[in-house]
Regions:
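Membrane-helix interface linkers and caps
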Residues: 2-15, 51-99, 110-117, 276-302
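Transmembrane helix-loop-helix hairpins at the membrane interface
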Residues: 135-335
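Interfacial loop-to-helix junctions that mark the boundaries of transmembrane helices
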Residues: 49-57, 125-130, 257-266
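Juxtamembrane helix-loop-helix connectors linking adjacent transmembrane helices
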Residues: 7-8, 46-50, 78-148, 159, ...
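Membrane-embedded alpha-helical segments in integral membrane proteins
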Residues: 35-49, 168, 327-331
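Interfacial transmembrane-helix boundary/kink motif in multi-pass membrane proteins
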Residues: 5-37, 77-106, 133, 261-265, ...
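Structural signal for membrane-spanning alpha-helices in multi-pass inner-membrane proteins
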Residues: 39, 43, 66-73, 179-183, ...
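Alpha-helical transmembrane spans of integral membrane proteins, capturing the lipid-embedded, hydrophobic core
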Residues: 28, 32-36, 40, 59-64, ...
Length: 336
C-alpha cells in the first residue's frame, strides 16, 4: 500500500480516541459537596414526604451523582468503578473484616451514647423510618446503598484520592471522613468514620467494588434484621450506614441509663479485643485471595514477626484492655 492508494480515503481506522482523564481531588470534593447540597434539598424532602420511596430516590440520585461526572470529565469508568470476579478467600475475609469494623462502630456509638445521651436520642427520633415490609427494606435500605453509595465513595471519590495519597491507611482515613460527613448528623460521625475507613481499606486491598459493596450490604442487612427482631438493640441499630432509615426511638433518660461509664468499659472489652483479631484475620484472608504470592499468617522473619504481632495484635489489645478496665473502675467507684 502506498500514499496514492490511501490519499483520498477516510482515515476511520487512524482516528485517535480522546485520552481518558483522571478525576482530581478537587473535582471529587466538588461532586461530594453537590451531593450534600442535594441531600439538604431534594433528597431530604423526598424522604420526608415519600418515606422509603424517598430513600430509593435518594440512592438513585447518589448513583447519578457518581456516574454523570465520570461521563462529563471523560474519565475511564473501568478505572473508576473497578469490579472483578470475586475470590472465595477474599469474600470470606471481607465478611470477617466487617465483623471487626462493625464491633468498632458499636464502640464508637456507645461512646457517643454515653457522652451525648440527649443528642443521641434526638437524632433517632428525627430519623425514625416509616413502616415498611422486609422485601422493600431489603432493596431500599440494604441493596441500593451498597451499590449507589459505594459507586460514589469507593468509586469516584477514592479513585481521585488514591492518585494523590498512595498509602492505604491514609486513603482510608480520608475516605472515612468523607463517609462520616455524608451521613450529615455529627452524633453519627465516629461510627460512620470507622465504617467508611474499613470499606475503603478493603477496597484498597482488593481493587474490587464487589467486596466493599458486599460488606455494605451485609452491614445494612444485619441492622435491618435487628430492627425487625426487636427495638432494644441500641448500639447495633445505630451503625446503619444510610442517611435516614433509622427505626429506633428512645428517650434521653433511656439512653443515659443504657450507657454508663461502667457499661461502656464492658462494651469496650467485649467488642474491642475480638475486633483486633477479626481485623487481622480478615486482612490475611483477603490477601490470601488477592495477592499473587500467598502470604503467611504471621511473617516467618523473627524481627518482622515481632514487629507485626506487637503493632497489630499486642499493642491494640493492651490499650483497649487498659481503657476498658479504667472505665469499669470509674463506673463501679463513682456509680456513673
Amino acid at each position: 500500500m502506498n500514499y496514492e492508494q490511501i490519499r483520498f480515503s477516510r482515515p476511520d481506522g487512524l482516528v485517535r480516541k480522546k485520552p481518558f482523564q483522571k478525576v482530581t481531588i478537587r473535582q471529587a470534593v466538588t461532586v461530594f459537596l453537590i451531593q450534600i447540597l442535594l441531600f439538604f434539598t431534594v433528597e431530604s424532602l423526598a424522604q420526608i414526604y415519600l418515606g422509603n420511596g424517598g430513600l430509593a430516590i435518594t440512592e438513585a440520585i447518589v448513583l447519578a451523582v457518581a456516574v454523570i461526572p465520570v461521563w462529563i470529565l471523560h474519565a475511564d469508568p473501568r478505572e473508576v468503578f473497578l469490579v472483578r470476579r470475586p475470590n472465595r478467600w477474599a469474600t470470606g475475609g471481607a465478611l470477617v473484616f466487617l465483623i471487626g469494623a462493625y464491633s468498632l462502630s458499636v464502640i464508637a456509638n456507645s461512646l457517643m451514647m454515653m457522652l451525648f445521651p440527649k443528642e443521641f436520642a434526638q437524632i433517632y427520633e428525627s430519623t425514625e423510618a416509616a413502616s415498611s415490609t422486609f422485601p422493600v427494606d431489603l432493596v431500599v435500605v440494604c441493596l441500593m446503598p451498597a451499590v449507589c453509595e459505594e459507586a460514589l465513595h469507593r468509586g469516584l471519590i477514592q479513585s481521585a484520592v488514591r492518585e494523590r495519597v498512595h498509602h492505604l491507611v491514609g486513603q482510608s482515613i480520608i475516605m472515612g471522613v468523607f463517609f462520616a460527613f455524608f451521613h450529615v448528623y455529627p452524633i453519627r460521625y465516629p461510627a460512620m468514620f470507622v465504617m467508611g475507613a474499613a470499606l475503603s481499606y478493603v477496597y484498597g486491598l482488593t481493587g474490587n467494588l464487589f467486596y466493599s459493596s458486599l460488606m455494605h450490604f451485609s452491614c445494612n442487612l444485619f441492622a435491618t434484621l435487628l430492627g425487625y427482631l426487636g427495638q432494644g438493640a441500641l448500639t447495633a441499630a445505630a451503625v446503619v450506614p444510610l442517611p435516614g432509615g433509622i427505626r429506633l426511638t428512645v428517650s434521653p433518660e433511656e439512653v443515659s441509663a443504657a450507657m454508663s461509664a461502667g457499661s461502656f468499659g464492658l462494651i469496650l472489652l467485649i467488642y474491642g479485643i475480638p475486633a483486633v483479631f477479626f481485623l487481622y484475620l480478615g486482612e490475611y484472608l483477603i490477601r490470601r485471595g488477592t495477592d499473587a504470592v500467598r502470604p503467611y499468617f504471621v511473617p516467618r522473619d523473627r524481627r518482622r514477626q515481632k514487629s507485626v504481632l506487637w503493632n497489630r495484635i499486642y499493642s491494640p489489645i493492651i490499650a483497649i484492655a487498659a481503657v476498658g478496665v479504667l472505665f469499669l473502675v470509674i463506673g463501679i467507684a463513682f456509680g456513673i
